[in-house]
């Protein structure tokens, strides 16, 4: 009798994806983040589901319902802070996962990469809408500022914004629809993740050398299941430390003030994981230009495979490209810092220089450096 693991139509899919999957023998800890992202998504869906049981998406009661969850629901505060800080862990893993892909040339699997970029946009949209739900000051003004950016679109902009708001300002209708979409999107993301994995398993994983590893594969289980579990424990340790000791460290104190359309907070800023894009948006004095730069700051990832000029796939043996990669990382950290600062000298000029450097590095300097490396190797 054949093994049920290999014969049952459903279990066979799990087997081919997580047990008997051939994986390169040399993939490092940077390949752990895919599974961690899966865990983050599952955690967000579960905690979000329980939070939705107690939350009310009405402007009059939304803020109170979140307070009620924290004060009166059994372990409601744990659910709330797991969900909020779980989003931060999600984005940390996302950015490290994308960074790994950039460094090791994983973007050469174009279908998987493009699916990943779509996933990134979907997760960012979900996180933005989730931030609006507690209906604090930063929720309200963040929603107002970011949705207002769409009014920069010529001709249809104003109508589009009012259509999204469901009125002439961010109000009851906006909150209700944001809750509906915030609930729906994670399930769409789950489906997209399956497509992402489908494309990945067509080609197999990349590895740190960037050289095909077809002749040296090992089964995913037990080697990488154990390795992933170690990464999982480390992530859970960080997440629980955040939730138990300083749950509000990554949040904004303004969001503990109920939304008030008549009082604008001194500094409107999004959650930390959007600050780099927010800094790029603010560094351009023109509204439409800023919106385009904001979208392009993420959309630029789509063009990375076409900007790959090196004869080698990975950066492992390319010291010039490595230096530029870490320059880009430092630049993104600088933008993240600037995004959280007020719009005044010297932050404005630092943000503008960092924004120029970001696009220049990706579009011009890195492709030229790759060509130079080819030349140095006489390729």
Swiss-Prot record:
Keywords: Electron transport, Heme, Iron, Membrane, Metal-binding, Mitochondrion, Mitochondrion inner membrane, Respiratory chain, Transmembrane, Transmembrane helix, Transport, Ubiquinone. Heme 1 (or BL or b562) is low-potential and absorbs at about 562 nm, and heme 2 (or BH or b566) is high-potential and absorbs at about 566 nm. The keyword Electron transport applies. The gene is MT-CYB. It is a multi-pass membrane protein. Component of the ubiquinol-cytochrome c reductase complex (complex III or cytochrome b-c1 complex) that is part of the mitochondrial respiratory chain. The b-c1 complex mediates electron transfer from ubiquinol to cytochrome c. Contributes to the generation of a proton gradient across the mitochondrial membrane that is then used for ATP synthesis. One of its GO terms (molecular function) is metal ion binding. InterPro entries: Cyt_b/b6_C, Cyt_b/b6_C_sf, Cyt_b/b6_N, Cytb/b6-like_sf, Cytochrome_b, Cytochrome_b_C_euk/bac, Cytochrome_b_N_euk/bac, Di-haem_cyt_TM. A ubiquinone binds at residue 201. This is Cytochrome b. It is found in: Mitochondrion inner membrane. GO terms for biological process: mitochondrial electron transport, ubiquinol to cytochrome c. CDD domains: cytochrome_b_C, Cytochrome_b_N. Its main location: mitochondrion. Heme b b562 binds at residues 83, 182. Its cofactor is heme b.
């Amino acid at each position: 009798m054949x093994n049920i693991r290999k014969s049952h139509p459903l279990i066979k899919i799990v087997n081919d994806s997580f047990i008997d999957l051939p994986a390169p023998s040399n993939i490092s800890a940077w390949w752990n983040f895919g599974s961690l992202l899966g865990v983050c998504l599952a955690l967000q869906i579960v905690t979000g589901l329980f939070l939705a049981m107690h939350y009310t998406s009405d402007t009059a009661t939304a803020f109170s319902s979140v307070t009620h969850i924290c004060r009166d629901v059994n372990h409601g505060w744990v659910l709330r802070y797991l969900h909020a800080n779980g989003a931060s862990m999600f984005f940390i893993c996302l950015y490290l996962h994308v960074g790994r892909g950039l460094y090791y040339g994983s973007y050469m699997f174009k279908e998987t990469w493009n699916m990943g970029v779509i996933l990134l946009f979907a997760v960012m949209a979900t996180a933005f809408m989730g931030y609006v739900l507690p209906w604090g000051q930063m929720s309200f003004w963040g929603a107002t500022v970011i949705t207002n950016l769409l009014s920069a679109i010529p001709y249809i902009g104003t109508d589009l914004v009012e259509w999204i708001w469901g009125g002439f300002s961010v109000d009851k209708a906006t909150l209700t629809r944001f809750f509906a979409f915030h609930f729906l999107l994670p399930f769409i993301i789950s489906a997209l993740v399956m497509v992402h994995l489908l494309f990945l398993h067509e080609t197999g994983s990349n590895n740190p050398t960037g050289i095909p590893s077809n002749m040296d594969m090992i089964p995913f289980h037990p080697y990488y299941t154990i390795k992933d579990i170690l990464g999982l424990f480390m992530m859970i340790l960080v997440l629980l430390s955040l939730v138990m000791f300083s749950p509000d460290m990554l949040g904004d104190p303004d969001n503990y003030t109920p939304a008030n359309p008549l009082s604008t907070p001194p500094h409107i800023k999004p959650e930390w994981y959007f600050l780099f894009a927010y800094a790029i948006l603010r560094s351009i004095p023109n509204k439409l230009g800023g919106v385009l730069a904001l979208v392009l700051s993420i959309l630029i990832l789509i063009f990375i495979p076409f900007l790959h000029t090196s004869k080698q796939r990975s950066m492992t043996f390319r010291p010039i490209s490595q230096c530029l990669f870490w320059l880009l990382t430092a630049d993104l950290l600088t933008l993240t810092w600037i995004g959280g600062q007020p719009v005044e000298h010297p932050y404005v000029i630092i943000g503008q220089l960092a924004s120029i450097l970001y696009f220049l590095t990706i579009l011009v300097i890195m492709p030229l450096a790759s060509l130079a490396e080819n030349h140095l190797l006489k390729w």
